[in-house]
Amino acid sequence: MSHPSWLPPKSTGEPLGHVPARMETTHSFGNPSISVSTQQPPKKFAPVVAPKPKYNPYKQPGGEGDFLPPPPPPLDDSSALPSISGNFPPPPPLDEEAFKVQGNPGGKTLEERRSSLDAEIDSLTSILADLECSSPYKPRPPQSSTGSTASPPVSTPVTGHKRMVIPNQPPLTATKKSTLKPQPAPQAGPIPVAPIGTLKPQPQPVPASYTTASTSSRPTFNVQVKSAQPSPHYMAAPSSGQIYGSGPQGYNTQPVPVSGQCPPPSTRGGMDYAYIPPPGLQPEPGYGYAPNQGRYYEGYYAAGPGYGGRNDSDPTYGQQGHPNTWKREPGYTPPGAGNQNPPGMYPVTGPKKTYITDPVSAPCAPPLQPKGGHSGQLGPSSVAPSFRPEDELEHLTKKMLYDMENPPADEYFGRCARCGENVVGEGTGCTAMDQVFHVDCFTCIICNNKLRGQPFYAVEKKAYCEPCYINTLEQCNVCSKPIMERILRATGKAYHPHCFTCVMCHRSLDGIPFTVDAGGLIHCIEDFHKKFAPRCSVCKEPIMPAPGQEETVRIVALDRDFHVHCYRCEDCGGLLSEGDNQGCYPLDGHILCKTCNSARIRVLTAKASTDL
């Protein structure tokens, strides 16, 4: 029969690739086995493994003593049992009944089975319908488990759904079914091609792909944990109307951090702004507190309340007192100072303060007072420390207005640009370079000679006397004198413009192209070619570039140089070129054309013949 070919292969020796081949072969034999399709109910019911537990006690009567659950006597055999059991209750003793059934496995009960085979097939058909509608294995959970532990032969009856009897010659289809599906009873129902399709992907290496996916997703999980674990003092920039503070379970009241995932500082009332873990949780190892991670400082602007301490055990710094009262924090607040806020309430809105980050008044330069001793309050800008440019500009403006409104008693000319002191009194100062100096302070930067009433040179707001200034100047490479005016630099050297000339024509090369020979002498281009250019072997003139050209064109023949217009035949004077009939045909060191060369050869040949 072709029924076993429909079942999925369970033996490990058979490769999975043969399953489709079997399916194709089964389809080819499907037409002649249509009559066998009526026998499909036994095929579906066979994996129920009902006969297996019944066969185990009969196979090994003196073995390990497999326990057979005491089922009630079958209803069909109730007529035959009273003669044996008498008035015993439905569950008879297991050992006696097992031996009795074992004593006649092929006797009367087997004959009744064979005689009522048709009736059993009908009952199996009805049972198959019931199995398709509901779970077919509920009536025999203990029998299936008992049958899975033993290893009975492959002979299992198709009709043993209720009776505890095993035939010796069961149908071939039932035998193969029980062999193919001994343990996975829940998957034995769908016998058609569909189970084969479902069993195909099972042997595939699915775990390898999942392992790769889990490996790749692990770094993502770590990143998520880190991003979800801000430091206890991290706070995003609060939006308008949003206030952050410390609640009853915040870090203001508990010195120990709650967990690796730190919640926002507080919740208000019953509103769920953020989840706060219970105080009993301990910090997870590996997710310690990073003091500088994600901390946001606004040291000079008014915003929400303060941040937490410098470590997990320090309390938070909160604003205390009236919200509109600004109070300088004297340094480090004691641990008990952070518990001023009542539990469950937000701290009062006020200027944000952070430890160590508030600017101190030391870096701010104290206001300079006039030398006359006048002093006064300059306003709040001199009291409140600030480093912003606009605040500094405002401070200087107020300072200037104060100096203008409160001049000193004596004649005040300003502050000295050299020493920074006030210049007070007539005859004590002078003005130079749009600045005010004391007479004793306005000196040469090199020799310290007083420059009042003397000519001086100002270089980058520095005063030089004339001798010192001249000594700082560069000297001309030609005349070796200091260059007081415009400097002309060439070949890495400094020149006076009138000293930078050609060594041959002696004209100034200021703004004119020039070149330098091997000895470092400066030449104009024309004189350089006249001096160093190759000379024509005909006219003996230097071969120079044409006017307006930068390249020199010359002809070299017989190791001699020629101008283009000088490259001619010595006899006829014809212009020679690279043409076929206009090439150079030298003879005895003479440059000749082809015609003249042939004529000279004939003459020489005739003369030689005459001499002979």
From Swiss-Prot:
The record marks K371, G372 as: Breakpoint for translocation to form HMGA2-LPP. Signal peptide: none annotated. Changing T610A: Abolishes binding to SCRIB. Residues 183-193 have a biased composition (Pro residues). It comes from the Eukaryota. The modification Phosphoserine is found at S116, S151, S375. GO terms for biological process: cell-cell adhesion. InterPro entries: Znf_LIM. It is found in: Nucleus; Cytoplasm; Cell junction; Cell membrane. Residues 1-118, 132-219, 307-387 are annotated as: Disordered. GO terms for molecular function: metal ion binding. The record marks I470, N471 as: Breakpoint for translocation to form HMGA2-LPP and KMT2A/MLL1-LPP. Residues 41-53 have a biased composition (Low complexity). Its main location: nucleus. Expressed in a wide variety of tissues but no or very low expression in brain and peripheral leukocytes. Keywords: Acetylation, Activator, Cell adhesion, Cell junction, Cell membrane, Chromosomal rearrangement, Cytoplasm, Isopeptide bond, LIM domain, Membrane, Metal-binding, Nucleus, Phosphoprotein, Repeat, Ubl conjugation, Zinc. Disulfide bonds: none annotated. There is a cross-link at K327 (Glycyl lysine isopeptide (Lys-Gly) (interchain with G-Cter in SUMO1)). GO terms for cellular component: cytosol; focal adhesion; nucleus; plasma membrane; stress fiber. PANTHER family: LIPOMA-PREFERRED PARTNER (PTHR24207:SF0), ZYX102 PROTEIN (PTHR24207). This is Lipoma-preferred partner. It comes from Homo sapiens.
